């Protein structure tokens, strides 16, 4: 067991890179299972990626990272996982990431792109770094329960290029409207014109 605030560095032979991890409260190294458990403000960094969460499990045998929130003394959920990949930051409830394939799976996530907020049920990070989103909401309202949103079935984020969504319907104050679109396109570049581009 490693005390809080210690940082360990381990070489992932399959990836030939360095994984750095730390935690504020406790680090437990299960040598037999080749697993490391990180408790309290846990952090993992590797090759341009960073994951922080209340609890993180490193499975060195399976080349996987698992992360989720933790409960505080009042039984409230705190320290939700935050996945940062280059300029993209995603907050979620739970995530799994494979350090070998670079694929990831996230549950109950939120993504902010300029003035747009995505609140989705699930997402998959592909090997090419695209993020595929399934079932959720798109809005420019920053409230937890937005005054209005577009209900989405799916969307794809291509880093530094674009965001494309499938069919979506407008909801206002929790009530669906007859307004809908077959798809939408959002530029996602450092130098871009802000705003949704709708089909003609």
Regions found by a protein language model. Name each.
Residues 2-200:
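Structural signature for solvent-exposed beta-strand/loop edge elements and short helix-capping sites
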């Amino acid at each position: 067991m490693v005390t809080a605030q210690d940082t360990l560095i381990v070489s992932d032979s399959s990836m030939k890179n360095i994984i750095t991890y730390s935690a504020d409260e406790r680090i437990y190294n299960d040598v037999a299972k080749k697993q490391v458990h990180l408790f309290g403000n846990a952090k993992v960094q590797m090759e341009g990626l960073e994951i922080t969460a209340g609890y993180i499990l490193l499975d060195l045998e399976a080349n996987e990272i698992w992360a989720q929130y933790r409960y505080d003394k009042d039984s409230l959920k705190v320290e939700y996982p935050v996945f940062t990949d280059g300029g993209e930051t995603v907050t979620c409830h739970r995530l799994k990431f494979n350090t070998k394939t670079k694929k990831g799976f996230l549950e109950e996530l939120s993504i902010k792109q300029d003035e747009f907020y995505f609140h989705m049920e699930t997402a998959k990070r592909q090997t090419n770094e695209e993020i595929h989103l399934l079932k959720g909401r798109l809005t420019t309202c920053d409230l937890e329960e937005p005054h209005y949103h577009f209900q989405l079935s799916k969307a794809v984020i291509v880093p530094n290029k674009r965001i494309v969504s499938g069919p979506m319907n407008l909801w206002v104050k929790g009530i669906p409207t007859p307004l809908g679109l077959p798809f939408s396109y959002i530029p996602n570049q450092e130098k871009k014109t802000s705003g949704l581009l709708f089909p003609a």
